[in-house]
């Protein structure tokens, strides 16, 4: 029995360390993406001001997923006042403590014909950390259509990130729809930016 308990503890430790390593690698890649995109609001000197919650294992959720093929494209407003064309792709349903929750995943209709982004799904959301420990305008998650197979989807809030509007003016960041407002705090993913908010030329 003692050997079984020891092996179980070792296995859990290995899995936990592996998950943390994966998340650290993901966040390093996330930072590098700012440097490879000339439109990005952050430069190398700014990356030190990015801040993240520690990994939260319970923030990795397996949700039920239902496609919404009858939904028509609509104009999603952004914080700059322009709109972006999206379509509801499906609904993820899960529990968080005592709460039963739904989040809508969206397909970007502008990028649909681009082979690099045709499988991309967008999950904007708000929660009770906004304006306290995270950006007031909500956060985003990137998903793939392949993630929605077999009627389930894994949502990892540890990978939640800020819209570029969190760092600078001049960007057209979609406003998370009311359907995606969670009535509790998700203390996982990216926190509020610690650097100075910038002003840049409006994106096109």
Predicted regions and their residues:
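Short, surface-exposed linear segments at secondary-structure transitions and domain or protein termini
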Residues: 110-118, 143-152, 194
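Mid-length scaffold segments of soluble, non-membrane domains
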Residues: 76-137
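Extracellular/lumen-exposed scaffold segments
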Residues: 21, 44-47, 52, 72-88, ...
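Extended, aromatic/histidine-rich regions of cofactor-dependent oxidoreductases associated
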Residues: 161-204
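Bacterial Sec-dependent N-terminal signal peptides
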Residues: 1-22
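Start-of-domain marker
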Residues: 20-73
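A mature extracytoplasmic/lumenal domain signature
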Residues: 65, 105-107, 127-129, 157-161, ...
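Acidic, glycine-rich flexible loop segments
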Residues: 122-163
